[in-house]
Each structure stands twice: as structure tokens, then as C-alpha cells.
Amino acid sequence: MTPRGFSCLLLPTSETDLPVKRRT
């Protein structure tokens, strides 16, 4: 798992949540 995906799980409010949600 990439660090970005992991960070999103721990911090859903992170800016990484934006691209991750689009992927799913």
C-alpha cells in the first residue's frame, strides 16, 4: 500500500482523501 493511501485511512480529512475517493 502506498503511503498516500495509508495516510488517507488514518487521516480521512487529509487532501489525499480527495484523489482516493475519486479512485474508488
Swiss-Prot record:
Top-level taxon of origin: Eukaryota
Q: In which tissues is it expressed?
A: Expressed in skeletal muscle and testis.
Q: Which CDD domains does the entry mention?
A: humanin
Q: Does the keyword Secreted apply?
A: yes
Instruction: Extract one GO BP annotation from the record.
Output: negative regulation of execution phase of apoptosis
Keywords recorded for this protein, A-Z: Cytoplasm, Secreted
Q: Where in the cell is it found?
A: Secreted; Cytoplasm
Describe the family membership recorded for this protein in Swiss-Prot or TrEMBL.
Belongs to the humanin family.
Q: Relate the protein's function as given in its record.
A: Plays a role as a neuroprotective and antiapoptotic factor.
This chain's protein is named Humanin-like 6
